């Protein structure tokens, strides 16, 4: 595919974080963007980024900038999109050394927000701050809540019930933010600030279930006046460019208290994106000097995440043979996952052959299910009792729900065979 002259090359680093995966999901279909990824270790990025470099130095390595510049020059990168708090800080502070622009907010904003203690100091006097304490001696009562001042997710965050355990926790050499314990609900507010500093969107979502600091069950709800007041005040005090978010929790009296602020994409901003607010893309529009507006469908929305399987296989083939009954169609419906693969295979230049013993007129049945016969390079309609193996050429794969058919093809043709549940291993998610 030829890219238009105005397409921008975007390098996401590090490309394997949940933040990076959300950036990828948000930008992969944009006609204005060509995505690239870079990681320090082998990770999930290689399964979703079509162009991905590994073994880039870690974010705290002095060699990082030179390594990224080599990729920027090789790939003609226009923008680097940081996808981790530490990467955001490092690349913002050293953006003058990079050969591409960094998608970021003002340096002072990034630096303050990287530390919870600095954030609380900067916002001193704001009514939505939790009660915080400089050290254990200043704590008047328990429980309290501690969290690394510089950190992300829920790593190291915990409730402390007495002085003994607080002293023990503080002895590990980590700088903590020590705050009042907040027993109420916790949630995140996704925000977008346009290039003129105007807050265009503030969308709260719950953090009902957390895994590794990422909200894996989240439900959006309407922002009330209290949330909007906090969002507007934070936006006024900081210099944000595009997407940012803050986390709130309620105290025992049901009042909102600020947990943290981050001037970056959040891994669960997909909740806002699927309302129509594509934060990663809107932030790029800011970078490009565009004036933007927001379309928000405003519908109820519940997200629940689980692990997804993505595979890399050494199977090579030029032709796909596929059955119809209980394969292309299952329980009276088209098999959407299989169709996804078939269209992907066709786009990759593979031949697709429908090989079926269908009892009825196959063209009428294809038409009934709105499956175009043009999807297939050939339709082979054989009688019941005929042997499918005689129609199969080498350098092929075979997809059929019937174990007996798969066994015959595997043993007689020596090619890989797939039941429906195995098709997921053939999908290529890279973009």
Which residue stretches match the model-derived regions?
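Non-catalytic pre-domain segments flanking phosphatase-related domains
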Residues: 241, 264-322
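Active-site nucleotide/adenylate-binding loops and adjacent lid/helix of ATP-dependent enzymes
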Residues: 109-184, 194-198, 225
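A short glycine-rich, hydrophobically flanked beta-strand micro-motif that places a catalytic Asp/Glu
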Residues: 241-253
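ATP-binding N-terminal substructure of ATP-dependent carboxylate-amine bond-forming enzymes
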Residues: 1-104, 419-421
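Conserved Lys-Pro-Asp/Glu-containing loop-to-beta segment of HAD-superfamily phosphomonoesterases
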Residues: 386-404, 409
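Acidic di-acidic motifs
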Residues: 15, 323-325, 398-402
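ATP-dependent carboxylate/phosphate-activation module, predominantly the ATP-grasp catalytic core
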Residues: 179-239, 250, 262-288
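Alpha-helical substrate-recognition element adjacent to the catalytic core
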Residues: 295-383
